[in-house]
Each structure stands twice: as C-alpha cells, then as structure tokens.
C-alpha cells in the first residue's frame, strides 16, 4: 500500500484454525496490561514449552498477541477497537491442555492480510486500507512475532474459513 508517506507490505495468507496458550488479560486491567502479560508469559514459559509447536530446528513457530471481543467470539475489539481481551501466547499443539494460570484459545481459521509492523500507525492505516478497498474486518486483529527474526506483524482477518 502506498498512500501519503506510508508504504506497507501486505501479504494475503490463509491460516486454518489454530490453538494458543497464554496469559489472558483485558483492557479493563488498565494501562500497561499487555506488557505485564508478556512479562508473566516469558517468566513462566517453561510451563508450556513442552506443548509449543516448533519448526524442524526446534524453534517455536510463533508468539501471538491474540485478541478477541469480551464474548470470546473473536470479533474485533469493541468501542472503536479500544476494549477487549488479549492473550500473550504461543502457538501450541491442538491437544495441549493449559496449565494452571494459563488460558487456551482455539482461534478460528481465516484469510488474513498480514502486515509487517514498521511504524506505530500500521493499525489505523490498515483500517483505512480495508475501507478504501471495500474489505471487511471479520474478526479480531492479532499481533504475531516471528521467533526466527523477531519481526512483528499484524494479522487482519478479512474472510472466515
């Protein structure tokens, strides 16, 4: 996308339903709650490490800042994308059970637009892009960190599978 001064690399990806286990919080928990969740998740990662999906080199395949509306229907955050649930999580085997203190989410399959996070205004620019291209956000946006290179992405669901 090139509009104004921002250029975004947008990739269309189909991802089947998948499972994550992490530390759950909500926007009702106040400022800084996401950083606190990641701190807890990182500190206690060993508790879920045996269930984490890994690539052929033994590297976890992904860490998700998974999001949902309060009903856990995986709809976009409410009140102009400012209120909802967040799970600081790792992708795990579908059969994994969440240890005590952890939460398991099964995220539905979607066609996503994946965007590399290279500036703080990626989210509003993508919402604008969706509107300009007559695309509908059909689920909650998720943050994703690729453990191989530490790159952050945002995943915007545009079609439910």
Segments and roles (model prediction):
Residues 2-161:
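A solvent-exposed interaction/effector surface
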């Amino acid at each position: 996308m090139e509009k104004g001064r921002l250029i975004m690399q947008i990739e269309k990806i189909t991802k089947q339903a998948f499972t994550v286990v992490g530390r759950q919080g909500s926007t009702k928990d106040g400022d800084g709650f996401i950083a606190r969740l990641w701190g807890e998740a990182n500190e206690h990662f060993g508790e879920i490490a045996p269930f984490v999906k890994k690539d052929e080199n033994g590297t976890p395949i992904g860490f998700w800042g998974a999001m949902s509306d309060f009903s856990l229907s995986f709809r976009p955050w409410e009140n102009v994308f400012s209120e909802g649930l967040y799970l600081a999580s790792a992708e795990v085997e579908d059969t994994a059970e969440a240890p005590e203190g952890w939460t398991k989410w099964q995220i539905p399959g979607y066609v996503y637009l994946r965007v590399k996070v290279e500036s703080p205004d990626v989210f509003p620019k993508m919402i604008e892009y969706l509107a300009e291209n007559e695309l509908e956000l059909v689920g909650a946006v998720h943050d994703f960190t690729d453990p191989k290179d530490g790159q952050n992405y945002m995943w915007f669901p545009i079609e439910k599978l």
